[in-house]
Curated annotation (Swiss-Prot):
It catalyses: ATP + H2O + cellular proteinSide 1 = ADP + phosphate + cellular proteinSide 2. GO terms for cellular component: cell envelope Sec protein transport complex; cytosol; plasma membrane. It is a peripheral membrane protein. The gene is secA2. Monomer and homodimer. Part of the essential Sec protein translocation apparatus which comprises SecA, SecYEG and auxiliary proteins SecDF. Other proteins may also be involved. It holds the Pfam family SecA_SW. One of its GO terms (molecular function) is ATP binding. InterPro entries: Helicase_ATP-bd, Helicase_C-like, P-loop_NTPase, SecA, SecA_Actinobact-type, SecA_CS, SecA_DEAD, SecA_motor_DEAD. ATP binds at Q83, G101, E102, G103, K104, T105, D490. This is Protein translocase subunit SecA 2. It comes from Corynebacterium diphtheriae (strain ATCC 700971 / NCTC 13129 / Biotype gravis).
Amino acid sequence: MAGFRWFWDAMGGKNTRNQTKSKNIVAQAAKRGVQFASLSDADVVARAHECAQHSDDESRADLLALLSIGAQRSLSMNPFNVQLQAVLRILEGDVIHMATGEGKTLVGAMASVGYALQGKRVHSITVNDYLAERDAEWMGDLVRYFGLTVSAVTESLNTEQRRRAYASSIVYAPVTEIGFDVLRDQLVTQRSHAVQNGADVAIVDEADSVLIDEALVPLVLAGNEPGTAPAGRITEIVRRLKENEHYSVDADRRNVSLNDKGAALLEQVLGIQSLYDDAHIGTTLVQVNLALHAQALLIRDVHYIIRDGKIALIDASKGRVAQLQRWPDGVQAAVEAKEGLVVTEGGRILDTLTLQSLMGRYPIVCGMTGTAVEATDQLRQFYDLRVSVIEPHKQSQRFDEADRVYATQAEKFRALVKEIELLHTTGQPVLIGTSDVSESEELAQALQARDITVNVLNAKNDAEEAQIIAEAGDIGRVTVSTQMAGRGTDIRLGGANEKDRDAVVAKGGLAVIGSSRHRSSRLDNQLRGRAGRQGDPGLSLFFVSLEDDVVVVGGAGEEIKALPDADGRIDSKRITDFVAHCQRVTEGQLLEIHSQTWKYNKLLADQRVIIDERRARLLDTDQAWVELSEAVPEKAHKLSDKLDPAILVQAAREVMLYHLDRCWSDHLALMDHVRESIHLRTIARETPLDEYHRIAVREFKQLAQRAVDLAVETFRDVTIDQDGAHLADAGLTRPSATWTYMVSDNPLSNNNRSVINGIGSIFR
């Protein structure tokens, strides 16, 4: 992608586009603010409504001035010029790059009000429930000052509460809750049962995380229907297998392969002739693969924890429990069996939606993050979004030390502990970012053994994160945390109340240490950005070993020679450059996976739009009755003679919607199955993506007619009376229970291709 950037830069797609003009508008807003200061509240609101309807420079300047006055009067907050500049760029549809601690929450609220004053419905999208509730409450007075309404949607709300919340002018909500509500609304058979009423604008906090890192994560709506899981006996047998003797794991530990000796042992114990016979290849072998992958690749306290007797997945990019997430391919059940837990029931996937497709439902998408510049290419490629860099209110005083590279992880760990101990003796607060729960606990134990009190923030105690982070800048504080992305609490020097601020400043501010480099430089910078908030002093430093994942994966196939000192440290610019190269390679791999997956998902997303439009017509008009009465006129005439038209329209609607929803679910299952096996088509010298698209188009054309044909057949035979269509009597029932979850990245994939009978197994 780096080679592509020069092209669009030359075409005018600069990160800092229009910033001179924006600064001039902000300067004009400051002058207008003085003139507007004497206006009454009613006049401020009326003038803001008027200015919001226009997009010329003068109106924009006036609107910024009036929004600033509103913030002062309602929140006692006086926005800096850089915050007004950020508001302006969001109102122009950009993603803003704004450093941690620069006041993005106020910026997002002011921009939301600016859009809402135009008559647009705004969804202010957060990464979790805590931030949605916090921001809606914190910024609520500003919204209400301008005569608008505000609400928060969280997991705890019931259907009626959600419906009321979505009716607000501005809605704060986690992206997952919005997506799940979209999916649930796609099952309603009466418009009044839907909770959402659409929105015009999505303002996305942590935009790179939502729009890039999690863009292709499917949100799933499932119904109760048995799925496939490994039998208990198979789990016990697989537990006996030994790595390198019965199976092998590839270098990056993403794939595991059963060898002949392992297969022979399983066949002997199970009493079967061959795992690869037709009778077993789609059943027993699938279960063996599931159990083996769960046993060999998924590690407790790295990929998941056990909480309240249930598996809780860990979001690697955030270091916290991934709420409502589960694995695909029956892996979830396999891990539950491995850990001796109750195996959860599988289900039929009724509908699915990626976050990228969800964002496509909004006419306007914009946002803010502290690491937008690093995601510029992806935001441009996948969303046609531009990045505007907002300079900090005060220049950063943070010192970014060069990486300390060690030969082995053991040597790196010893040096890391020694450095933390040294900093702690000075009283300087230290925040250490680790890659997973297991590492955070190991590091905490090593520090505690040296009589250092440690606060640990990881997926096991993420409910306490706000308090732990708020105190991380206190004098002498040592905090160990898995990932800092999406943790919205600021770290203030001297503690939450800044009582010892001067003392901490004198000691150099907050020291942030990364225990390794991540596969994306954005994640490194999210951690680094916690130090040096609003011109504070600070320090950032990363420890790296040549055994770290980013080096092993990014440097695969390359030989590197180095001479470590007695402590294992390699002080060489050549090695430091090599580590940076490895990170760029892994970033390129992630981007390629995203790009390829997007190409597969794009056609299904387009087909979904057609299904949504068809469903809306059936839901909002009498189209279903018109089509069915034309197809079966005799029955339609008889029913019309004795039943109210409203009953007939609703009965026809339910018949049509049932078969449309069912056929769409079947289509998703089929295309997932096609995608799992599409790589085999390269053997026949066919292009996998082209073949996938050919099949998807062909099957979708058949879907439309099949749904209508089935509906006509049902309409002809089903009983329709005063109580409507008796679909249940005809064996046509919707699931009695549904649930939602996110499909975590499949840990058992190679080039984004499942090596076992994938998510389609849940459908069948």
